[in-house]
Amino acid sequence: MFNVGDFIVYPMHGAGTIDAIEEKDILGEKQSYYILKMPGEVKVMVPTDKAEKIGVRNIIDKSSAEKVFSILEEDETEMSMNWNKRYRDNMEKMKSGDIYEVADVVRNLSFKQKEKGLSTGEKKMLNNAKQILVSELVLAERSSYEEMENIVDNKINQSFKEFRIDEESPLTNMVNKFIPFNE
C-alpha cells in the first residue's frame, strides 16, 4: 500500500506523486482510489486494490539510478530488423514498467535515430520512453527535468561515440571492415 506523498511510477506514464487517496462511488460501488499527480499536471485515478497488478511501484533509489546510467552507457542490444516486430518488442518493454527495460528502449532507439533515422511511430515511442525514464530519474536523483535530460543525452552520446567507429559513415566502416583493400 502506498501513502499520500509517495513517489511512484505508473507504467507507460512515468513517475509522479500520490496526491490523495479517495473513496469514489462509481456505478453504485464504493471504491478506494489513489489520485496520482503525473508530469504535465495530469491526474490519474488508480483503484488501490489493483495498483500492484497494474504495475504501480515505488520509484528507484540512487543505486538503481546508477544501474540505469550504466545501461545508457552500453552498446545497443540486438533488435529486429522488422519495424513492426521491433515496435511490438519495444512496446512490451515499456508496458512492463521496468525502468531498465525502458532505458534499453531509449538507448536502442537513440542509436537507431543517429544511424539512419526513425519512423514517425518510433520517434514518438522514443520521446515517450525518454519522458518516462527522465521523470523517474528526476525524482530518484532530486534534480531538474532539464538537468536529467541532459545527463541522459550525454550518456547516450558518449556510448554512441564509443561503440561506433565513425558516426558520420557507418556504411563506410562496414565496407572497410569486410572488404580489405590491397595496396
Language model region names:
Residues M1-V56:
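A positional/architectural concept
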Residues D49, I54-E183:
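Charge/polar-rich, low-complexity and marginally structured segments
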